[in-house]
Amino acid sequence: MFDALLRYMRPVATAFVALLALLIPDNRTSHEPDAALSAILSRDFIQVFTRNTPTTYYEGRHGPTGFEYDLVRRFAESLDVSLSLNSVGNIGDVLSAVRDGRADLGAATLSLDPAEPGILYSRPIMSMQPMVIYHRGIPAPTTPEDLLGLDIAALRGSGTGRALRDLQKSLPELTWQETDELEVTDLIEMVEKGEFDAAVVYAHQFKLNRLFFPDVENGFMLGAPQSLVWAFPKDSGVALLQAANRLIDRLHASGQLDELIARYFGHDDYLEYVGARLFIRHAQARLPRYEAAFKEAARDTGFDWKLLAALGYQESHWKPRATSPTGVRGLMMLTNDTAAEVGVTNRLDPEQSIEGGATYLLHVKGRLQEEITEPDRTWMALAAYNVGLGHLYDAQKITEMQGGDPYKWADVRKALPLLQKRKWYSQVRHGYARGGEPVIYVRNIRRYYEILNYVDRSRRQFHHLGERDDTFPQTPFNTVPPVL
């Protein structure tokens, strides 16, 4: 199902050029055409209204992050002004702020809706595909008719709700519950807990969150793809809109927009549900015993403690007495030589092992070429932790031989498996290696790291997982009745 997702998310500007032209009237208003842009340049900041969600904007380890945050930050930089963000509760609040002029721009997973009054829309930024998701305990819905009789949830004001309304025209008996006071992750969690049979969300939103909810499965794509756009006040001129469109066009043409989409939404699904479920269970049962040690090692080495914890899980499933047939031992699975190098005297002591593993990873990272920047530097250090620096250098050489960038993990990871083929390992210094293993190794660590980040962020910002009631007793869902 997700193999086609990036295809759906490719820019779809061509199909909407004519429509967008219709959305921009010839007789603008009595305002100057550049009124909004002039005001922004004069005050030296742009006011953007958004929502605090994993797919739009949130506070990450190093400050604000998120797909739409990255885009509006670039837009502010292109105007040479500061960025002022105002996070509000729902899409309706964003559009109201745009409509009445409190916002210069709205960026909040908005879909193009020509019927929305008082709004001008940018060119399409990416395509968003509505998708039915469902609880694994029910028969899998595979057609729209299978939705009849199910308890379905959707977000009011979103394009996913419009997809259901479009479907209701051909299935008038269809009904569902909708709200504008929750986020997508709330809906997914409610399906996970069996409070709803199904929900309609965007495919990229589910893909970003699916491993955190192992009892939720993707059903089928519902309706046509929709366009993610920015919203601008209709009565403030079009110069700001045109400036945004120029930025979007540049990002499309340069490939930078595709890179951003892949960065935020293009992860491979390399952990199965069973693996995700097991990891979450181990994170609850085992990790608390070692969390303080990971945090201490993080303070000493500068790594995020959750990255070190993810590395430890990949190595031993957080088992302090783990031993491999090759003689590596302990929670971080250190060899005798590595342990001696980093001052570990007892590999089975979890605190020593964690500190030693973090120190060794820092040493490896420090021996990489200075041209390698983050986050590639961390991913390559992890690969070298697994396969050895010599083999990583060999993979970089093969990458260069193939015309790739030896300082980019996306290129080097393609070359690593070639170390298993005589044609390639015979041309490099360190010879044969099981080069596919470090690729899977880094993939798994990144996904474990994502899950730990999600849980940590949930504690502080979103859901407070495990600390709240099992239901949402005060949630104001409204029933959308059948049209019989």
Curated annotation (Swiss-Prot):
Q: What's the Enzyme Commission number for this chain?
A: 4.2.2.n1
UniProt-annotated stretches for the region Non-LT domain: 31-268
Asked if the keyword Transmembrane helix belongs to this entry, the reply reads: no
Q: Which GO terms describe its molecular function?
A: peptidoglycan lytic transglycosylase activity
**Is Cell wall biogenesis/degradation found in the keyword set?**
yes
Mode of membrane association: Peripheral membrane protein
Key words, A-Z: Cell outer membrane, Cell wall biogenesis/degradation, Lyase, Membrane, Signal
Function, as annotated? Murein-degrading enzyme that degrades murein glycan strands and insoluble, high-molecular weight murein sacculi, with the concomitant formation of a 1,6-anhydromuramoyl product. Lytic transglycosylases (LTs) play an integral role in the metabolism of the peptidoglycan (PG) sacculus. Their lytic action creates space within the PG sacculus to allow for its expansion as well as for the insertion of various structures such as secretion systems and flagella.
Please give the PANTHER family that the UniProt record associates with this protein.
Answer: MEMBRANE-BOUND LYTIC MUREIN TRANSGLYCOSYLASE F
Quote the entry's note on domains.
The N-terminal domain does not have lytic activity and probably modulates enzymatic activity. The C-terminal domain is the catalytic active domain.
Record protein name field: Membrane-bound lytic murein transglycosylase F
Instruction: Identify the species of origin.
Output: Chromohalobacter salexigens (strain ATCC BAA-138 / DSM 3043 / CIP 106854 / NCIMB 13768 / 1H11)
Tell me the gene name.
Answer: mltF
